[in-house]
Amino acid sequence: MSEDKESDVVGEEEESHVIKEDKELNDASNETLTENGDQLLQMIAELRLENDFLRSQFEGLKDEVAQGRSLQKAEQVEADSAQLKQLQEQVASLSREIDVEKQTRVAAEQALEHLREAYSEADAKSQEYSSKFSQVEQKLDQEIKERDEKYADLDAKFTRLHKRAKQRIQEIQKEKDDLDARFREVNETAERASSQHSSMQQELERTRQQANEALKAMDAERQQLRSANNKLRDTIEELRGSLQPKENKIETLQQSLLDKDQILEDLKKQLQAVEERKQIAVTELSAKHQKNLEGLEAQVVDALSERDKAAETISSLQVLLAEKESKIAEMEAAATGEAARLRAAAETLKGELAHLKSENEKEKETWEASCDALKSKLEIAESNYLQAEIEVAKMRSQLGSEMSMQTQILSTKDAELKGAREEINRLQSEFSSYKIRAHALLQKKDMELAAAKDSEQIKSLEEALKEAEKEVYLVSAERDRAQQDLQSALASLEKELEERAGALKDASEQIKSLEVKLDSTVARNQAEKQAWEEDLRVLEETWRRRCEALTAQNEASPAEGIEKELENAKLRNKRMKEEHESVRELADRLIEEKDREISRLVDEMTNLRKSMESKPVWNKSPSQVHHYGNNNTESQQQDVSNLSTSAAEHQILILARQQAQREEELAQTQRHILALQEEIEELERENRLHSQQEAVLKTELREMERKQKREGVDMTYLKNVILKLLETGEVEALLPVVGMLLQFSPEEIQKCQQAYHSSTTAATTTEATPSPASEGSGLSVFSRFSFS
């Protein structure tokens, strides 16, 4: 700065000397010299203004560099040190040039002393020139004032730019706060997902407990049924040992058996209804399980979409940062730290999003494992239920076999009763015949007594009477014993019948209790099934809503969002390229203008030298004066050229720095564009993977739905449809029905239709002449088969 001031003072002194020298020159030479002097003064004033402006810019850049040094890294410090070394070298070269200029100035001062002695007569003209010079000074003062006003405007603009930069930094801080808020929201969603996961685990534990309780209840019921079966077996064995019923009680028992058979048929119907309900419940459970899987996949896709949205926000923020960095290139030194911090925050957000994605995948795997465990538990419960039903069926078959055995035993007892009755009738007939014979004997003996006259005959007859009475007494005793035996047998049979009736009552009561237990178990199973259905319905509704939202997002957002991102990235790339081209063109324009100014100044210097060298020499003293004047003008021209070259070099340095900054900014923007392109490629790959996964899941869902629908198909109706298809050959009419019943996929239906059309076309081409076989082929499909 001091050297510039000294050069300015020396320039002013030299200008005054030049004015004094020009007083004694010719009018033409005076006019040319005054014109040249005015031009030089204007050039000097312009160069001074430019020099001051460049100094102010250089000072501002120094301040910015001083502020940015605290934020720059080691590489920037090394670069600044290299630049400082270059500047020191330039300063040394400039100091050497200044020394040379001082030497020339000393020689010029010596020449000026000679000129003062020679040009003492030019005082009048010098006064005129001094008045002109005062006017010029006034003009210079005015220009200085205008320059100060311009500087004030520039300072105001700089303050406004500084305020805008501060506002932009505040906006970036707000955007960072928004990002933090979004990150908190993502964390909250993750916490909600974890809470939902814990609630689902609790529900799974509750369902496990319920399943265990149901299994325990089924085991207890199984034990009760076994104990009841054992009791029934014992009672049946007791009944087998004591069954001799009467006919009326046998009829009542047969009627009760018929009633029991009816009850058993009702129970079979109820069991069939329970089995149908069980199948419906299993289908509903599988459907709900599938919907749960779909809901879990929807949650995973929601998390991925949130991750994609966060990535989009990060990329948009990065683009905004890049644009703002390009707009405030001069303030980038102050904002690089903040941008780096934001980029680090964005990278941390990306890492956290990847972590969230991995956690979501782990949660999905855990959900799938839990669903598989639930499936296995459901299968175990179903197998236990089937085993219980099998055991109930076995018990029913055993009861039926035991009832058949009881009926056989009753029939045998009936046969024994018939034999006993026949024996009683035989004994009664024998007793009556014995009575008749005894009465005939008595009559015969009476006749013999009446006919006998002798005592011996009477005595013999009396003895015979006594023997007959004894025999009658014995027969009556035997009859009494037989009657007592019959009465005791009848009493024992009555007792056995009463015991059997009591046992049958106990058995019927046990059967009723078993029926009540069965009804209670069925009601409990139905209540549990209803509770499960309610829970599954709620889960199905939630997962269905999520699946619908996911499908809507998958159908609407991914392709459009990626295309929009690609278009935005392309537009940003074009915009940045255009800005780079405009900046490069502006820099090239400025460099060309400065080159033109430098070439113009060099041409003017050469012209001045030529004009000064071409001046005539008048006499010795004038020759000395001329020589002295030439030296003075040459020194002045050297000073002007030095000033112009130093200003031009300084401006070139500033332009070079600006160009380097712009190139660095361009490299940063190119790197940013490459990063954005890589992110776009990653997003495209992820979108392709998501679409593939979505297609696979959709196919699996459709296949599972078709399997579930196949399970509820009426096989008799399917059999009739297939028989009608084979009999009539109406493939076009009955193929959709078969496809609906068996849940064919669209590809399978197309294959069947293509095969049918190809077979029909082949038949029409091969069978040109009609034949019975061809006539039958149009009516049924059986004609295509050969039956041996």
Swiss-Prot record:
Keywords: Coiled coil, Golgi apparatus. Residues 1-15 have a biased composition (Acidic residues). InterPro entries: GRIP_dom. Residues 708-755 form the GRIP domain. It is found in: Golgi apparatus. Residues 1-30, 612-643, 763-788 are annotated as: Disordered. Residues 16-26 have a biased composition (Basic and acidic residues). One of its GO terms (biological process) is Golgi vesicle transport. The keyword Coiled coil applies. Residues 763-775 have a biased composition (Low complexity). It comes from Arabidopsis thaliana. It comes from the Eukaryota. One of its GO terms (cellular component) is trans-Golgi network. The keyword Coiled coil applies. This is Protein GRIP. Pfam families: GRIP.
